[in-house]
Amino acid sequence: MKLHELKPSEGSRKERNRVGRGTGSGNGKTSGRGHKGQKARSGGGVRLGFEGGQLPLFRRIPKRGFTNINRKEFAIVNLDVLNRFEDGTEVTPELLIETGIIRNEKSGIKILSDGNIEKKLTVKANKFSAAAKEAIEAAGGKTEVI
């Protein structure tokens, strides 16, 4: 086999359909858009969720809830992630950002108990779940709310 004999495998390359190039092509004149109407126009088509004038679903369903403007979002750190630190390390928010475990502090850091911890660490965070606090202390570490 030589370079000039190479050909793409059968059916792997499809020629694109050029519309509006004469009636003989099968896609001339109206270019597959039919005659007149909203969908035949440039930029034509109904908006997302439009149901032909019928009251749309999102307006038929009652409103629910509200957005709490004082909501605090915490950066979440699970216990299994803390195993990468050496025994006796003081884990602070600054250290977590520095090591790339979290990107930013948000409204603070919350330690959750997913996974298990084998290291003795002093963990400083804004919040701890009860199970996480228990697990850290069971491993011989300390928790400190900042």
UniProtKB/Swiss-Prot annotation:
GO molecular function, one term: rRNA binding
A Gene Ontology BP annotation from the UniProt entry: translation
Record's keyword annotation contains Cell cycle: no
SUPFAM superfamilies (UniProt xref): Ribosomal proteins L15p and L18e
Keyword Ribosomal protein: yes
InterPro entries registered for this protein in UniProt: Ribosomal_uL15, Ribosomal_uL15/eL18, Ribosomal_uL15/eL18_sf, Ribosomal_uL15_bac-type, Ribosomal_uL15_CS
Region spans: Disordered: 1-50
GO cellular component: cytosolic large ribosomal subunit
Domain of life the protein comes from: Bacteria
Composition-biased stretches (Basic and acidic residues): 1-18
Keywords: Ribonucleoprotein, Ribosomal protein, RNA-binding, rRNA-binding
HAMAP family: Ribosomal_uL15 (MF_01341)
Record function comment: Binds to the 23S rRNA.
NCBIfam families, A to Z: rplO_bact
Family listed: Belongs to the universal ribosomal protein uL15 family.
Subunit structure: Part of the 50S ribosomal subunit.
Protein name: Large ribosomal subunit protein uL15
Originating species: Listeria innocua serovar 6a (strain ATCC BAA-680 / CLIP 11262)
